[in-house]
Amino acid sequence: MKSSKLNPVTTHKEFNGISGALGITIGLPTLTVLFYLLCNQTYSIHGINVDFAKIKSQLPITQDELWQLVFDKTCWSAYLAWFFILVILDYLLPGKSLNGVKLRDGTVLNYKINGLSMSSLLIVLLLARLFQSNSDSSLEYYLPELQFIYDNQLQLIIICFLFSFMLAVFVYIISFIPLAKPNGIGTKERILSINGNTGNPFYDWFIGRELNPRIGSWDIKLFCELRPGMLLWLLINLSCLHYQYHNLGYVTDSMIVVNLLQAFYIFDGVLNEEGCLTMIDITTDGFGFMLSFGDLAWVPWTYSLQARYLSIKGNEVNLGWTLSLLIVGLQALGFYIFRSANKQKSDFRQGKLPHLKSIQTKTGSKLLVEGWWGLSQHINYLGDWLIGLSWCLPTGFQTPLTYFYVIYFASLLIHRQVRDEMKCRAKYGEDWEKYEKLVPYKIIPYVY
């Protein structure tokens, strides 16, 4: 593998290297399909007892059945239309122009932030279709598009996986094509991820070789982070609500709570997309299969598990006003911790909170040790986790399956914390040891 000043060779492989990358590449898509097989109109798990015969009965037996499942023309057409219409809208819709962080070649990338116009258009189109459908159909509040999503979930899950696989191959290939114009140091090298330049094709494809793959000014990574998967998650949830209404004749309060809480989270992310420009996904990680699959398949199909579970006959949960308000309050608390902690750190970095105690490091930066950030090193992670817990609680306690998200998310946050700690320990040295004595807790104050 050729090393350069701009793109040094990656020597440390994350996720236990190639074996871990292979395990994730096979395991997570399999898990996504398994979650569907465990929770759908044909079979829904109760408790921890799995009926393997019913799972097996849902799988294709013949080659023709497998072909029809994987290459359903209608589903492929629908998904490709969804993805590329969003691409066109992302390019055409107005938005403010913001610069990202400074890159290794001294340049900065410009991003168009148009989450507000994109979200507004989606809401208007949904309401317009609902009004039109009511005029054309004898069924009240019936949307064939939402019914299509609900009826073809397994096909769409497989399509999302295959598309994310192909997208990862595409960005890996273009990472080897020289830039049309010189970069900030006068060469035509693309800026590669510090984690994705090992020289092993499979690992670099998985972790992401190029830092910011673009077609012209259109940024593939930021688009996938907040557009196709996040907005599809919203539509999947609505399809579950839609299905429950047309089968029960009403919508349960638990379904309403899940839809409202997750819709708030989705729109909060899309409307505050400028915050992504300083996140590790954008600034440090390359865009490969890990992010492609996570954004396009994992997020919409595993994060919507609670709504799908509640839509199934016999799984209805009636919370009542008290429990509903308590769960909403839990998400509000999580958001308050998450947002206020992040704002405090941002304000401190901008010099707006000079009275807060900090450690002056030898690198020239400061480590905050007061306020939210005196409670734990990643107090914002706690807020984020509480938000996820509020999504799971409306499903009751009939099966641990609907609590997978908070278990998975906890492991993800701990992995991020350990990863961040290793980098900070290497960067700050003795100053980090002083910091750990003043802020000993990692995420949860007095616990971890």
From Swiss-Prot:
PROSITE patterns: STEROL_REDUCT_1, STEROL_REDUCT_2. It is a multi-pass membrane protein. GO terms for molecular function: Delta14-sterol reductase activity. InterPro entries: ERG24_DHCR-like, Sterol_reductase_CS. It catalyses: 4,4-dimethyl-5alpha-cholesta-8,24-dien-3beta-ol + NADP(+) = 4,4-dimethyl-5alpha-cholesta-8,14,24-trien-3beta-ol + NADPH + H(+). Its main location: endoplasmic reticulum. It is an enzyme of class 1 (oxidoreductase). It is found in: Endoplasmic reticulum membrane. Pathway: Steroid biosynthesis; zymosterol biosynthesis; zymosterol from lanosterol: step 2/6. Signal peptide: none annotated. Disruption phenotype: Leads to the accumulation of ignosterol (ergosta-8,14-dienol), and of a new sterol, ergosta-8,14,22-trienol. Results in slow growth and significant increased sensitivity to an allylamine antifungal and to selected cellular inhibitors including cycloheximide, cerulenin, fluphenazine, and brefeldin A. Slightly increases resistance to azoles. Significantly reduces pathogenicity in a mouse model system and fails to produce germ tubes upon incubation in human serum. The chain crosses the membrane at residues 18-38, 75-95, 108-128, 157-177, 251-271, 279-299, 318-338, 394-414. ERG24 reduces the C14=C15 double bond of 4,4-dimethyl-cholesta-8,14,24-trienol to produce 4,4-dimethyl-cholesta-8,24-dienol. The third module or late pathway involves the ergosterol synthesis itself through consecutive reactions that mainly occur in the endoplasmic reticulum (ER) membrane. Firstly, the squalene synthase ERG9 catalyzes the condensation of 2 farnesyl pyrophosphate moieties to form squalene, which is the precursor of all steroids. Belongs to the ERG4/ERG24 family. PANTHER family: DELTA(14)-STEROL REDUCTASE (PTHR21257), DELTA(14)-STEROL REDUCTASE TM7SF2 (PTHR21257:SF52). This is Delta(14)-sterol reductase ERG24. It comes from Candida albicans (strain SC5314 / ATCC MYA-2876) (Yeast).
